[in-house]
Amino acid sequence: MKLQLFAHKKGVGSSRNGRDSESKRLGVKRADGQFVLAGNILVRQRGTKIHPGVNVGKGKDDTLFALIDGYVTFERKGRDKKQVSVYPERKVAQN
């Protein structure tokens, strides 16, 4: 009597997909007109999409942070650049 044995599990190839990098949580962290404390992060970014303005520092990874306690203001810098500043008093819009 001959006994024929078969594999009881099918051989499975591995997929070359199925991995992704963790998100970096970039973007604007404080809104226009919001009160911030010195050291608060205003924007996390790669490159200077938004430039540092008055009372705003820039970290080595281009993170913008408040240098003083005050109110956040997003402004235009020329025609095509944006900047964020922090002022001790709330800025009133001039019409």
UniProtKB/Swiss-Prot annotation:
Keyword Ribosomal protein found: yes
PTM annotation: The N-terminus is cleaved by ribosomal processing cysteine protease Prp.
Propeptide boundaries: 1-6
PROSITE patterns with a match to the protein in the record: RIBOSOMAL_L27 (PS00831)
GO terms, biological process: translation
Keywords carried by this UniProt record: Ribonucleoprotein, Ribosomal protein
Residue ranges of the region described as Disordered: 1-25
Gene Ontology MF terms in the entry: structural constituent of ribosome
GO CC annotations on file: cytosolic large ribosomal subunit
NCBIfam families registered for this protein in UniProt: L27
Family: Belongs to the bacterial ribosomal protein bL27 family.
HAMAP family: Ribosomal_bL27
Protein name: Large ribosomal subunit protein bL27
Natural source organism: Thermoanaerobacter pseudethanolicus (strain ATCC 33223 / 39E) (Clostridium thermohydrosulfuricum)
Encoding gene per record: rpmA
